[in-house]
Every structure is written in C-alpha cells, then in structure tokens.
C-alpha cells in the first residue's frame, strides 16, 4: 500500500466515523479558546473544563485579565499542570492582546506567536478552531498516531515535520477536522501505553497493528 492510499483509507474512515468533530475544550470566545488551549499543555481537556468556568466568570476577556497580577489568576488554575508558569503567561498574553491588538486575538500566525506562552501548536489550534483556517496542530496524540499508522516517515521526528508531512497529503478542506480525528483517535483508541488495536477500524492498514498480528 502506498502512502497516498494509506491516507485515502484513513480519511475515508474518519469522514464516515466522525463527520462532525470539534474540540472537547469548552469556551465562549476567541480569547477563552486561547486561554483554554494554553492551559491544556500537558493536561487533560477534562481537567481544563473543570477549571475554566470559574476562571472565565472572573476573567471573561483579555481586558479583565490584563488588569490583575498572575497570583490572582493562579488561584483559579492551581489544579492544572505548571500553574505558576501558566498564570504568568496568561496575564502577560492578555496585556499584550490589549496593548497591541485592541483586546482582540490576532488572526495572523506570526502575531499569535509573539504572545507569551503561545507556540506553534497552540497558534494552529486557535487558527483552525476560532478562525476556520487550514492549520493542523500536532500534539503528542497526533504525533503518535501519525507514526503508528505510517502516515509519516521515521525522518519526520519533530512536530513541525509531522505537520508538514500530514498537510502534504490531507486535502485542505479536511485539515481542520484531521487534527481532531487524529487527536481523538489517539486519546481514546490508539493510546500511548496500551493501544486498543483490536477495536480500531484502521488496523487492516496500520503497520503497528500488523506487527502485533492484529487485523479484522
């Protein structure tokens, strides 16, 4: 099977299984999405969704968060990973959004990357989910699933290389959904330590499943 055929199989499977798919993070605005994504680094969406309702009631927008110190934000996010660093980044981000962008989250990738605590993965999520752009964020789930399914080569050994490889084969109209497809597949089926290959609808074409002697 060629790599192109593998992509076609994968895309056909997910289009049928998850035609409508979206982030599991809960938010009410572009600012709140950015905050939630920043908080989600090395933390589960479930945990973030437990924290953000109170956080967003207190800080619904960039202007309200920009007016306080990190210690006040910290009180709302103590249960997430690296709370001190994230609180610091959130306040600095909010202040820059207010000062440079009039309180609105910028659409431009380069401008997003100037915000404290915002890397390429976070910027891609915001561009895709908030602004509908054809960007594909590569987190640990997307990275793992892409390699296990043989969608990328061993040489694609960084998130950026995986992103470039995936977007080369995935049609532009499917790129926003593809991030969620691969992420959710990695979160619930192709898990890190004990992947559920026996119930995976892609095991017929998965090199990793084949090595374990598993297929339909």
Provide a role label for each language-model segment.
Residues 2-216:
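Catalytic cores of DNA base-excision repair glycosylases
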């Amino acid at each position: 099977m060629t790599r192109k055929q593998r992509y076609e199989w994968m895309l056909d499977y997910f289009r049928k299984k998850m035609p409508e798919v979206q982030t599991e993070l809960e938010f009410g605005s572009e600012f709140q999405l950015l905050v939630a994504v920043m908080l989600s680094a090395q933390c589960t969406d479930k945990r973030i969704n437990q924290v953000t309702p109170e956080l967003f009631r207190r800080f619904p927008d960039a202007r309200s968060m920009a007016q306080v110190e990190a210690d006040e934000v910290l009180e709302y996010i103590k249960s997430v990973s690296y709370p001190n660093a994230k609180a610091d980044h959130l306040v600095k981000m909010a202040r820059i959004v207010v000062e440079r962008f009039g309180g609105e989250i910028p659409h431009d990738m380069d401008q997003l990357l100037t915000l404290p605590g915002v890397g390429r993965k976070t910027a891609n999520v915001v561009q895709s989910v908030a602004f509908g752009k054809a960007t594909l964020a590569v987190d640990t789930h997307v990275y793992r699933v892409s390699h296990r399914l043989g969608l990328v080569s061993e040489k694609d050994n960084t998130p950026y290389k995986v992103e470039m490889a995936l977007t080369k084969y995935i049609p532009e109209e499917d790129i926003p959904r593809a991030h969620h497809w691969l992420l959710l597949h990695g979160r619930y089926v192709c898990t890190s330590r004990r992947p559920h290959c026996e119930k995976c609808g892609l095991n017929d074409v998965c090199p990793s499943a084949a090595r374990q002697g598993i297929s339909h």
